[in-house]
Amino acid sequence: RRFQYTAIDDATRVRALKVYQKHTQANAIDFVNHIIQKFPFRIREIRTDNGHEFQAKFHWHVEDLGIRHAYIKPSSPQLNGKVERSHRSDQQEFYQLLTYKGDVDLEARLDEWEHFYNFHRPHGAFKGQTPYEALRERLS
């Protein structure tokens, strides 16, 4: 079993994805460091559920980076609706169609899916634009 961590920009829907074998604070911290390197913009806030992987060590790591960490209300996944909706897309458009031969292959395929989602997949919220087209438009 693998656990997918997802970061999604609220304004553009640009996403970063990574899979881990466990939900741990160390993995959550690694993921934050990953998205800081990956996203072409400054991250001002990270919103998470109240899972054990997002507690004290994670919280203070994020705050020390100058990023606000906000928790959603317990038992309220709808408050993280963009992530939840993107997970449904992942399930329908990626995982259900996936055949892979191990962890390395899964990571490579997930990277391909992330690239497709960000650069080629049209989004209804942006009148058919991709997340990176929406980002370019916001920056121009």
Predicted regions and their residues:
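RNase H-like polynucleotidyl transferase catalytic core
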Residues: 45-50, 62-82, 98-103
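An active-site-proximal beta-strand-loop segment
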Residues: 1-16
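Hydrophobic (often cysteine-bearing) scaffold residues that line and stabilize catalytic clefts
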Residues: 28, 47, 54, 79, ...
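Distinct, well-ordered alpha-helical segments
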Residues: 32, 58-59
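C-terminal domain-tail junction helix/linker
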Residues: 56, 65, 89-140
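Active-site beta-loop-alpha junctions of metal-dependent nucleic acid enzymes
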Residues: 1, 17-41, 45
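Acidic/histidine-rich, metal-coordinating catalytic segments
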Residues: 23, 41-55, 75, 127-132
